[in-house]
UniProtKB/Swiss-Prot annotation:
Signal peptide: none annotated. This is Palmitoyltransferase akr1. It is a multi-pass membrane protein. It comes from the Eukaryota. ANK repeats lie at residues 96-125, 130-159, 163-192, 196-225, 228-258. The DHHC domain is required for palmitoyltransferase activity. Pfam families: Ank_2, DHHC. Keywords: Acyltransferase, ANK repeat, Endosome, Golgi apparatus, Lipoprotein, Membrane, Palmitate, Repeat, Transferase, Transmembrane, Transmembrane helix. Its main location: membrane. The chain crosses the membrane at residues 314-334, 335-355, 375-395, 402-422, 499-519, 549-569.
Length: 737
């Protein structure tokens, strides 16, 4: 399945004869019409590049008389003059059968293509050594607006070139998900094969395009289709060695024991292609041993560990035990032994959780992707409430009634808003009900020149409202996406942002009240008969030994006050600007870099200073779905580094270091959603949605008017200074969760 076409960047890998499948000839819908070198994405294709001899011959033709050059550069008036003078027709062909429409298509000259079609150009004319159509030429350059125009004008997507490739195969080889979405909605059979029996899914797997593999499988492609050599998509994925592709195929039921005509299983192919590590890792991810058989646990817990619902409850409740064990050890053992014993116990219990994660569902293989962190907070909240009800309240209810009343109120509010933020739909953009609806949306976006990653989500197949973002963790687009918060194991978006802010605000106040109550409680307890301490003085020893468990728990709560205070401050500032965390990251990335602000906001919002870990890439858009990337590189982080990020320790150093490098403060770009501090705050706190109860999905206020973020596709016309978000259409400098 090799390709000699450098312009499509096809990967040549291994001896294909050993796989029982000969590689197809050079992929290219244009034959010699393909430049021998990869041109820049915005570079036009020169005539001399296609055929140097003919290019030299054309050098003597005046530009005004050269129909092919005029088509290439898109000079519609010059083309009109040639037609008016009857020197050429729209269906003029050179000696290889190439038409002006071919040249206009490959150079992305939309106006010229439209003019030629209006002038009667044959949309299905074949030319070049590979006998390809203009649509095929455009597809290999990823000009999907040109492809859409040609399809509208009658281009046949099932036509093939001399090598048997249709436009779907060529688009897959190029690797653009948006072009593939367009073509699949043309009702092209998803499993249409080339001359050697390769389906589009096989090409996507071989090229290492996980986004396209996922798209084909969701569209119904056969995961166990075979080519002439008996190779399945799984075999081809292992030829490339793309772990995401292999994982996705196994997820959709690819046969792990399928044999080629030469009797080679995927395991054998992996060995021949030196991708055995990828194969073994993929098997382990889905609970299979090295032979591809389901793992059998000696303890008989395999079925329990694989149950996502059960494991979700385990990861949420397990930190309850960890918090209790840590506090109990620190409060009941001598300090010299307590600290190391506590560390050993905590790391041991966390190792149990990590071991369960490694054996559990594939999406839980990373502990931070489980409800574990939300369980840490819930466990802390539970033990604070337990200690308060059974120990603090009985002693202080008569001496501090107001303080107890306030704490009870804020503790209840914190619990309510925490649970609501965790279980509430954060603002998932509704999915479309049918492919016909998807096709209608795509057509509308093409008409508006908005069919791109900014306005359409390939994963959800929906039009993206303004301020929305696709969350990889939730696998959905979220309206007015703020961030994905591991402490509530949910996204924060249009529906639960206010509840989330109320949760952290009530938590902030509740912690302060609990600390005061704790000191009142300790002072009310009788002094121990014979206090004995080795480090602290007698007075402090007398105070600590009255109820060490409650004091240690109080210290743990105070630690949480650090990141809670930072988060509340960030959210309040962003509310005053009518700005989300996502927009804050994004606005600062467009030639206006504030490293300290990005590190700070990312850490307090999502538990890490890494924009990638926060789901906020340097442009804020996430991975570019238009570019079907290969396997991502994963950086390994130790336990201490992970926890330092989660507790905000590395944020302090990042803020201090980057703050020294920040240049003079530039003028902040205008925020199209800001209506001034007072109006922004009023819109957020006083919208019609109930504080206690479910709001209408996506409903909010902007400038005093009720809007719905699920259906807001146009930028508000009114512009005010403030905020840090300017453009809703910026290019992602990354590749492209």
């Amino acid at each position: 399945m090799s390709s000699g076409n450098s312009s499509t960047g096809t990967h040549t890998n291994g001896n294909f004869a050993t796989l029982g499948s000969s590689p197809p000839s050079a992929v290219g819908g244009k034959g010699r019409a393909i430049p021998p070198k990869v041109t820049h994405e915005d570079a036009s294709v020169e005539l001399k590049t296609m055929n140097p001899e003919r290019g030299a011959a054309r050098g003597s033709i005046p530009l005004g008389e050269d129909i092919m050059q005029i088509a290439r550069i898109g000079e519609v008036p010059a083309m009109q003059r040639l037609f008016d003078e009857k020197k050429f027709s729209a269906n003029h062909k050179d000696e290889e059968g190439i038409t002006p429409l071919h040249w206009a298509a490959i150079n992305n000259q939309y106006a010229m293509c439209k003019f030629l079609l209006d002038s009667g150009a044959d949309v299905n004319a074949k030319g070049g050594e590979s006998v390809a159509t203009p649509a095929m030429w455009a597809a290999q350059r990823c000009h999907y607006y040109i492809v859409h125009l040609l399809l509208q004008r009658g281009a046949d997507p099932l036509l093939t070139d001399v090598q048997g490739y249709n436009i779907l195969h060529l688009a897959t080889i190029d690797g653009n998900a948006f072009l593939l979405v367009l073509l699949l909605h043309q009702e092209i059979p998803v499993d249409v094969v080339d001359q050697q029996g390769h389906t589009g899914l096989m090409w996507a797997a071989y090229k290492g395009y996980p986004a396209l593999v996922d798209l084909f499988l969701r569209w119904g492609a056969h995961a166990n289709a075979v080519d002439e050599g008996g190779l399945t998509p799984l075999h081809w994925a292992l030829v490339k060695g793309s772990l995401p592709c292999v994982l996705k195929l196994i997820e959709y039921g690819a046969d792990k024991f399928a044999k080629t005509r030469d009797g080679k299983t995927p395991a054998v192919v992996a060995g021949e292609m030196n991708t055995t590590r990828v194969w073994y890792r993929a098997l382990d991810e889905y609970g299979y041993d090295l032979d591809g058989n389901a793992k059998v646990s000696s303890s008989g817990l395999a079925s329990w560990v694989r149950n996502k619902s059960l494991m979700s409850k385990f990861f949420f409740l397990w930190p309850f035990a960890i918090v209790f064990a840590a506090v109990w050890i620190l409060s009941n053992m001598v300090v010299y032994a307590a600290i190391p014993m506590m560390l050993v116990t905590v790391f041991g219990l966390q190792w149990v959780a990590q071991k369960a994660a490694s054996q559990g569902p594939s999406e839980y293989r990373i502990l931070q992707k489980t409800p574990y962190l939300s369980g840490v907070f819930a466990g802390s909240l539970f033990w604070v409430g337990f200690r308060y009800v059974f120990y603090v309240l009985p002693v202080t209810y008569s001496t501090s009634p107001i303080l107890n009343g306030l704490f009870a109120i804020f503790f209840s509010l914190t619990t309510y808003f925490y649970i609501y933020s965790m279980v509430e739909d954060p603002g998932f953009v509704p999915k479309l009900g049918s492919r016909n609806q998807q096709r209608a949306v795509i057509t509308e976006l093409f008409e508006q020149w908005k069919f791109d990653e900014e306005n359409f989500c390939v994963s959800c197949m929906v039009r993206r409202p303004l301020r929305s973002k696709h969350c990889k963790r939730c696998a959905r687009c979220v309206a007015k996406h703020d961030h994905h918060c591991p402490w509530i194991d949910n996204c924060v978006g249009a529906n639960n942002l206010r509840h989330f802010v109320l949760y952290i605000t009530c938590l902030e106040v509740g912690i302060v009240l609990f600390v005061q109550l704790t000191f009142n409680y300790i002072n009310s307890l009788p002094a121990p008969a014979q206090p004995q301490c080795n480090i602290i003085n007698e007075t402090l020893c007398d105070f600590v030994l009255r109820d060490t468990f409650t004091l240690v728990l109080d210290l743990w709560v105070c630690i949480q006050l650090v990141w809670i205070t930072m988060l509340v401050a960030v959210q309040m500032i962003q509310i005053s600007r009518n700005q989300t965390t996502y927009e804050n990251m994004r606005g600062h990335s467009v030639d206006r870099s504030y490293p300290s602000s990005r590190a700070f906001a990312s850490a307090v919002a999502a538990g890490t200073t890494s924009l990638n870990a926060a789901g906020l890439t340097s442009s804020g858009q996430g991975p570019n779905p238009a570019l079907a990337q290969g396997a991502p590189r994963h950086r390994k982080h130790g336990c201490l580094q992970q926890w330092s990020s989660l507790l905000g320790i590395d944020t302090f150093f990042a803020t201090a270091r980057d703050g020294l490098r920040d240049g003079p403060r530039a003028v902040r770009p205008k925020n199209p959603f800001s209506r001034g501090v007072v109006t922004n705050c009023r819109d957020f706190w006083c919208d019609p949605a109930p504080y206690f109860g479910k709001r209408e999905p996506g409903a909010a206020m902007l400038g005093g008017e009720v809007i719905n973020y699920n259906r807001m596709y146009e930028t508000p016309s009114r512009m005010h200074s403030g905020g840090g978000y300017q453009s809703l259409s910026v290019e992602d400098p990354e590749q492209g969760v």
